[in-house]
Amino acid sequence: MADKKLDTQLVNAGRSKKYTLGAVNSVIQRASSLVFDSVEAKKHATRNRANGELFYGRRGTLTHFSLQQAMCELEGGAGCVLFPCGAAAVANSILAFIEQGDHVLMTNTAYEPSQDFCSKILSKLGVTTSWFDPLIGADIVKHLQPNTKIVFLESPGSITMEVHDVPAIVAAVRSVVPDAIIMIDNTWAAGVLFKALDFGIDVSIQAATKYLVGHSDAMIGTAVCNARCWEQLRENAYLMGQMVDADTAYITSRGLRTLGVRLRQHHESSLKVAEWLAEHPQVARVNHPALPGSKGHEFWKRDFTGSSGLFSFVLKKKLNNEELANYLDNFSLFSMAYSWGGYESLILANQPEHIAAIRPQGEIDFSGTLIRLHIGLEDVDDLIADLDAGFARIV
């Protein structure tokens, strides 16, 4: 299916008859024990337990194999590991490749729990972490060490949405520490708007909770990797007991079928809102990768095939607690909630000092309150009207 366009791939990926048993969708196979008809059948399953053969529930069932196959087809990987959430996918992908004395180099705009895992957990294991500016490009060589084992990217960056120059970073890393494992949190692009492995990245990680599930009703993480990393990532995850239930795997596979049309709507609506915000007199800056002038926009334009619905903007004013509560509490369509990627529109606020506190060795260049939006599938004119009413509450 690699020669087919994305929408066709999304509809068909992982839907072989082996997994559907003649139905349209993959079967939901819930199992812990899987029965062998003979000693020889057990031996065969044991030999092939890591290659999509039914062996034991923790290795997966037909439901899991269908999703894993789909993810490999969509992201061009040699294998896919499923995790109970995105944070588990990040932590276990890193753990699979590091040992005492290693160094991890991570963007300082990574998701806060990813940073915390490195600073609070890896530090106890004798692994050091340092941080780089998301727009550093080829100058990342200044931060590489002989013991750098993992270089961890996230593009766009969490909250402030900077886009990396990935080709420059990958080339620089390969020139200095060619054996380092390069990983990326690819959740914003849903693994399909930015084909990470095509750019020389080794492991593409997602909180599939977000766009792949698409309905805010299940939690799951994925890590798709190249052949070089597959066995080590797979076996580490197995030994760490990482798995998801069959129903969650099924829900995620089902979400893939509508991902293309949903992403197009997220792109269209979020960009329209971003353009409207960019002209608003109370807005200092809009951070949307698809909007000219946003940090790294030229890299988004070169390397991505579309946009999702998550972005942020900065108010000219820093709201006090009372003003912020009045602003956030009275939206009719935007709900306050963590996560994103579902059909619904969401809003959260961050004060500049909070962003500064979670930017290790980094600086922020704004002083107003930052608002993060996820633009859902509602009518965009209704969303703009709701935001406009919010601005009227800021005096």
Curated annotation (Swiss-Prot):
The protein's Enzyme Commission number: 4.4.1.13, 4.4.1.28
Pathway recorded for this protein: Amino-acid biosynthesis; L-methionine biosynthesis via de novo pathway; L-homocysteine from L-cystathionine: step 1/1
Catalytic activity: L,L-cystathionine + H2O = L-homocysteine + pyruvate + NH4(+); L-cysteine + H2O = hydrogen sulfide + pyruvate + NH4(+) + H(+); an S-substituted L-cysteine + H2O = a thiol + pyruvate + NH4(+)
One MF annotation (Gene Ontology) recorded for this entry: alanine racemase activity
pH dependence: Optimum pH is 8.0-9.0.
Disruption phenotype: Disruption of the gene increases the amounts of L-cysteine and L-cystine produced after 72 hours of cultivation.
Residues with the N6-(pyridoxal phosphate)lysine modification: K210
Activity control note: L-cysteine inhibits cystathionine beta-lyase activity competitively. Inhibited by aminoethoxyvinylglycine (AVG).
KW Cytoplasm (keyword) present: yes
Superkingdom to which the source organism belongs: Bacteria
PROSITE patterns in UniProt: CYS_MET_METAB_PP
Location within or outside the cell: Cytoplasm
Subunit structure: Homotetramer; dimer of dimers.
Listed name of the protein: Cystathionine beta-lyase MetC
